Amino acid sequence: EQKIDLMNKALAFINPQLEDFGITAIESMAAGRPVIAYSAGGAQETVIDGETGIFFKKQTWESLFDAVLNFHPTNWDSAKIRTHAEKFSEEIFKEKMKKFVEDKYEEFKAGLVQNKLF
């Protein structure tokens, strides 16, 4: 509850660390809030620079400071940010994973048939 309330009141979420995925950045975008993120790791796959947030290139306080100074809270489309975050929902992840496994299984079966092992 408190986290949701804080995200709804925030102008942006600052994600200065290197992470593989970064669930809090996704949660922030689900609340329609842009992300100010270090341009490395999972942020490069979840944040769209200029659309759902902005990147800073170096993991230094100066680079983060410049990003915050250049951030304009009125330049963001909350609905568009929320829509982007939906791509990372549990349901969509399950659908993509299921399709991936099914496709690989079909490829495996096709290889067995082709090699007359099935």
Residue ranges, per PLM feature:
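A charged, aromatic-enriched C-terminal amphipathic alpha-helix characteristic of glycosyltransferases
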Residues: 59, 73-118
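Short alpha-helical donor nucleotide-sugar binding micro-motif in glycosyltransferases
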Residues: 5-10, 97
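Conserved active-site histidine-acidic residue motif and adjacent donor-binding/catalytic loop
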Residues: 1-6, 59
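Acidic donor-binding loop of glycosyltransferase active sites
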Residues: 8-20, 33
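Short alpha-helical segment that forms part of, or immediately flanks, the ligand-binding pocket
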Residues: 4, 26-30, 44-45, 51
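Active-site donor-sugar recognition loop in glycosyltransferases
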Residues: 2, 16-21, 42
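Short glycine/acidic-rich beta->alpha loop that forms part of the nucleotide-sugar donor binding site
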Residues: 20-23, 29, 39
